[in-house]
Amino acid sequence: KKKGVAQQRVKISIPLPEEQWTLFFDDVDLGPEDVVGEVDEGFSILFDSLNPERIILAALCCGIGRFALNKGVAYASERNVFGQPIGAHQGVQHPMAKAHTAVEMASLMTRRAAWEFDNKLPAGASSNMAKYAAAEAGIEAVDAALQAHGGSGFTEDTGLYEMYPLVRLLRTAPVNRELCLSFIGEKVMGLPRSY
């Protein structure tokens, strides 16, 4: 640990296995031996190193979405009102079908990003699209499953509501949707830099 480097734990309200920390650098002297990569290329190196994280988190969001939808479909198939399953009603069925479609599309982009990364191809575009799409799809899926369950979706027995804070966090961190969209706009679509 270098002189002038300090760390402080950040307490977050979502139970996660990993911890969050803030690092402070006050008058830290660095020598050539401390340089990682090439001088003045740090931002580019950082973005490339974040692609695997985006792919992993996209896969996690797809998994959360599938978990939630499996619960929602099971409940909507079993719960009968006025002699028929509530899943027979479009108001219950369509939001889950829409969320399922979004999760599967996000999963395909996640697989593409993973394939590109594994084959040492540029994966920035697909990683950002996967992260964006999967986080949005995960939230949509959890919300649709909660709505299908009604009030019982918020009970501990369903295990649904516990998914919402995590999938909502993943929409914002470690990279928020706006940065993903800015990357896509600039690097994929050729639009002027927005940040």
Regions of interest found by a model, annotated:
Residues K1-A74, Q84, L179-C180, E186-K187, ...:
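FAD-binding core of flavoproteins
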Residues L46, G72, A113, A130, ...:
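Short alpha-helical scaffolding segments that buttress acidic/His motifs in well-ordered protein cores
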Residues V73-G87, H100-A133, L146-F154:
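C-terminal helix-coil-helix/basic helical segment that borders enzyme active sites and/or dimer interfaces
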Residues A137-A145:
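Hydrophobic alpha-helical segments of membrane proteins
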Residues H149-Y195:
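Glycine-rich phosphate/cofactor-binding loops in nucleotide/flavin-utilizing enzymes
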